[in-house]
Amino acid sequence: MPKILIGIPVLDNIEMTRVCLQTLYKHTSVDRLGLDVSLVIIDNGSSDDIAGLIKGEFNGARFPTYYLRNPQNLGVARAWNQVLRFSASATYGSAFYYNYYVISNNDVLFGPDWLQPLVEAMETDDRIGLVSALENGSPVMQELLDAHSRTKKYRVSPKKHYTSENIMGSVKMIYKKWGGHESFCRFVKGNNLPLFIKGNRSAVCFMVRPAMIQQVGFFDEDYSPIGISEDLEYFLRIERIITPPWITENTYPEEKKWKYGFCGKSIIHHNWCMTRQGLHFDGRKWEKQKEKNWKAKFGKSKKYYTKHFLGMFFMPILSSFLEDFLLCLPFH
C-alpha cells in the first residue's frame, strides 16, 4: 500500500483554500491502487483562521489531515521542504517516511481521480523523479490552452473581495463550453495522451520521488521569503545547468539525470497566481526582487538562463512560461 503525503502551503486566501480542500477530498480516489493518503497544510503565517477552517469544516475528513503553522511567512521553498520532511509517525527531519510526495498550490481545484495517475506514471520508470498534473495552460493540448485563455477572462480578481461561491462561479464560466470542469477533465483523459509526457514542467501541483530529493537536494531556501524562483532553479539543477557543490559528475552523472514531465491522465484547474496575492500585494515589486536575488546568487539574470537553457530543454512550454508571468502581475 503506497504511502502518499499531499502538502499544501497556505498564506491567507481562506476562501481559495476552502475550495481547494473541498475538491481535494471529493476527487482524491485511492481504491484502484490502494493508496494510503495523508494531507499536511503548511500555514506560512496567515492572518486568516486556516486552523479554524480545517478543524471546523473539514473535521473528520476522508484521510488524516495535519496542520503545521509557521510564525511568519518563511517562503515557498521552506514550506515545500517542510512537506518533504514531515511525518506524523516518525521523527521530524528523519529519512523520508512516504513513498511519494505531492506538493500543490492552494489555488488549485482538483479534477476527478487526479492522484492515482500520478502514482501510475511514477511506477512506469524508477528514473522519473517529478511528474506534474496537467492544468489550464499546459501546452500539450489545444483545449488546455483554450481553458487558460478563458481563465484570464473569467478568474476572480485577487484585488477584490471574493467568496468560495465566486470562485466556483468563475470556474463554471471558464469550462462552460465543455459542460463544466469535471466534464472537461473527462474529455482530456479521453484524448489518449500518454500517461507520462517527458520534458515539460510545472510546479503548480507535482509529485516527487524521495530518491531524487536525496540525490539532487531539497529546494533552495535562500532569500526567503521572496526567494529566487525555486521551481526554475530546481529544474535547472535536475538538468545539471546549475550545480551546487554536492552535485558532481560522480554524485549525479549526466547520463543518469532524472526525468520529469506531465501526467496525461491527471488534470487540475489552476486559479493563476492567487497563492500570494491580496489587496496589498505588489506583484511587480515581488518579481523584481526575485530577479535581484537570482542575479546575486548566480551572477547572471534569469533572462540569461531562460534564453540559453529554456529554449534547449523547455521549448514546448516557453511561450506558456512567459504568458503565465504576465498573468501573475497585478490587476489594473
Model-derived regions, located:
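A conserved acidic beta->alpha catalytic loop
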Residues: 23, 41-52, 72
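A conserved hydrophobic helix/loop-capping motif in glycosyltransferases and polysaccharide synthases
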Residues: 4-16, 20, 27, 42, ...
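A short, conserved alpha-helix in the catalytic core of glycosyltransferases
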Residues: 199-217, 224-266
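Conserved donor NDP-sugar-binding/catalytic core segment of glycosyltransferases
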Residues: 108-167
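Short, acidic, metal-binding catalytic loop of nucleotide-sugar glycosyltransferases
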Residues: 22-35
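Glycine-rich, basic loop-to-helix element that forms the pyrophosphate-binding segment
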Residues: 70-94
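A recurrent flexible, glycine/aromatic-enriched loop bordering the glycosyltransferase active site
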Residues: 169-208
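Short beta-strand-to-loop acidic/aromatic patch adjacent to the donor-nucleotide binding site
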Residues: 94-109
